[in-house]
Amino acid sequence: GMNSSWQWYKNGISIPVLRNKIHPYYGIYFPTRFDHLVLFDNWLKRYQGSKKTAIDVGFGSGVLSLQMIQHGFQKVYATDINPNAIVGLSEFMGTTKLSRKIELDFGHLFGKWNKQTELIVFNPPWLPEAHDTEGIDNAVYYNKDLFPDFFAAAKKRLLPEGKLVLLFSNLAQITNVSKEH
C-alpha cells in the first residue's frame, strides 16, 4: 500500500475530466472509477445558475472542487475530516490562482462555512457503517447520522434558487449490504 501510494503521489493520476493529473497524499480518497465524474462534468456544462460560490463537502483529492473551478465557479469552499486531504490539495494548488479560488477547511460536513451558496456538492461514503471507522474508511462507510445531519445543515446554507448535487453509489444495494439506501 505504501509503495503504491508513493507512486500515485509522485507520478500523479490522470482523471479524464481534469486538465492536470492529481497527486493524492497517502490515506486520501481518490476516484478509481470515473462514471460519476463524467456525469457531474456533463451536469456542470448544462448548469445555468449563478457561479459565484459553491461548497464541496468531503473533497478528498479535490476532483469535484477542481471540476467546479474548471467550469467557471469563482470560489469553492471545501471541507474534509482528513488532515492529509487539506495538506495534499494545499500543496497541489501551491500559490497558483487555484489557491485563491478554493478555500479549504478541516472539519465535519460544512466545517466553518456558514455562508449561503448557489451549489452544494457531496460525494458521500457509500456503505453503511458496520463498525467504528477511522482514516480512509471514513470515505467508504457512513454512520446513521450522516445524511440527516448533512441535509439539515445544507438546508441552512443553500440559497433559495440554489442546487444540491449528491453523487451517491448504489454499491450497498448491488452487494446486498443494505436494502435501505
Regions found by a protein language model. Give the residues of each.
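N-terminal auxiliary segments of SAM/dcSAM-dependent transferases
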Residues: G1-I13
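Terminal helices and disordered tails flanking the catalytic cores of nucleotide-processing hydrolases
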Residues: N3, K21, P31-F34, N42
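Short, aliphatic-rich beta-strand segments
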Residues: N20-Y26
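Conserved SAM/SAH cofactor-binding pocket of Class I
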Residues: R33-W113, L119-F122, P128-E129
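Mobile active-site "lid"/loop adjacent to the S-adenosyl-L-methionine
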Residues: P83-A85, P124-D149
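Short amphipathic alpha-helical segments
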Residues: S90-E91, H131-G135, V177-K179
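Conserved Class I SAM-dependent methyltransferase catalytic core
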Residues: L146-H181
